[in-house]
Amino acid sequence: MADYSGESGLLSCESCDMVFRSWALLATHTKRFCIGRLTPEVTLKSQPSVAIKRGTKIMAQEKSRDQEASTSALKRLTEETAGSPGERLRVLQGTRARRMAETEAQSRALERRGEELKRRLHSVAGPKGGLPRPFDLERELRELKEEANRTRGALQTLGAHFQALQLQPRKLQDTHRAVEFCYLPLRFNPETLAAEIRILREAYVHGGGRDPEVLDKILQLQVEASALELQRSQNRKEKLSAASEEVLTVEAENRLLEAEILALQKQKVLSLSPWGSRDLPGHLSRCDNSLLPPLVAPPIPQLTSSTKAQNFHGTSKTILNGTMTRKMGLDLHFLLPASDVLGPAPYDPGAGLVIFYDFLRGLDTSWIWVQLMTSLARNGQDTGGTTALPPALCLPQPSAPGPMGNCAILASKQPVPRLPPSPLVSLICELQAWHGVTWAPQPKAWASLLLFDQDLRVLRGRWRLPLRVYPNTSLSLAQRNEIPQAGQAELFLRLVNARDTDAQTLAEINPANAHEYQYPPMVSSSSVESSFFTHSSAFADPPPPTEEAFVSVKDKNEHLSPHQF
């Protein structure tokens, strides 16, 4: 058996003559892999193989390399630990500073590279599809200059027409104002800023101006001026002292006395003339109808006569210039209290009833003007005779609880004389609105209100009616309640007997008092139908019209007449 234990520190197996470098490998081989010696013949004839010699040589070389690596590592470690702790710390600090400087230099190089790439991308792509920015800016500046020149020319033309209109005599101005021109009058004093803007708009239109942008801008200024005037009037009302309350009360009483005097003068003239209002003097019958009081004289503005006008749909309808109760700073202490007695009350068919249209709230912010169209319906069927109330300007939302949106002050009253009571009679209100400068009103919403209960009593009260979307078809009451509401728009009105008109005329109209109005009671369709058969026999024909009423119907354009449906 060959013995290799003395060569290079190798360990040989006693059973198979294999050599190993460590005792662990030899033990593992002996325990698991050793198969013993070869046969004696082979053992005697064989010599150590070339493979074994080559493996021994390779293992010796590897061992020498490992020893050299261990020696160099030990030397390096000895050199590093040879110095003092301070020296080692300085070496580490220097190494750290050197590495940080290298890192910063690399970061700056990367940033410069990124900026260079961005510049190349901008130069390749270019702004707005490849057009260079200077040319783009030049084109925008040129367009802005052209638009400014057009606006300047329009303003100069408008100023020239306005100066020419001021130089003309008053008679010529009246002649120009008599030309048919459909515009919506503002209910403000001529001295206000809104009235001046309205005059400016008239001058622009009479001069031939039809630019929609200019008209829209003037209309926006008019709305802002109206809102500013309303805010100023509210501020003045809040600043009234106790000393001025008596003066305002005396002024209101004087206006009442003046209205009564005018009413007596009218009655005197009618009694002297056998043909009624057709023989009235010219200054009372034709041109100055605004000086005459309404049938029930209001305390502040006076009701003008009903005039025939062409509505915005092309059909002729009666426009009632209702009483516009702009309060002149009266204190609530001297007015009708908010909790006035209103509720179901006996009804006098001869006298009729009166409807006060106070205001609208929750309107869409895109609406500029609104108009209310009213009519009567029996059992859901329209009886004809639609009437248009005066248009109202949309104002900003008041700072008070209520529906969100703009508001509009209607301030109109509508007498309904000689109406037979019936639980099937209802009031139908249609809301129309103007958008922008198109001047074509569009129907937006509608509402209905029953006028009598099952006991044929008039449903007096302050009512708030939710305005519902179209279509306004002949539906039952239950079906009407299922129609969705048009946003948050609501109509606020008062329904009273004709004998209560004087007291209700003194009530203040303020959109901030929306909480004083209630929703009408819900009435089922079955109860209404049963009450119709119960009370149908009790209906009586209205009395025949008197001679004065006949004359008023014949000449309704010459004097005041009740609001007809």
From Swiss-Prot:
Keyword list, A-Z: Coiled coil
Q: Does the keyword Coiled coil apply?
A: yes
- Give me the ranges of the annotated region Disordered: 58-87
Coiled-coil intervals in this record? 97-160, 219-271
Q: Which domain of life is it from?
A: Eukaryota
What InterPro entries does the entry give? CCDC17 (IPR038800)
Q: Does the keyword Metal-binding apply?
A: no
- Listed name of the protein: Coiled-coil domain-containing protein 17
From the broadest rank down, the organism's phylogenetic lineage runs: Eukaryota, Metazoa, Chordata, Craniata, Vertebrata
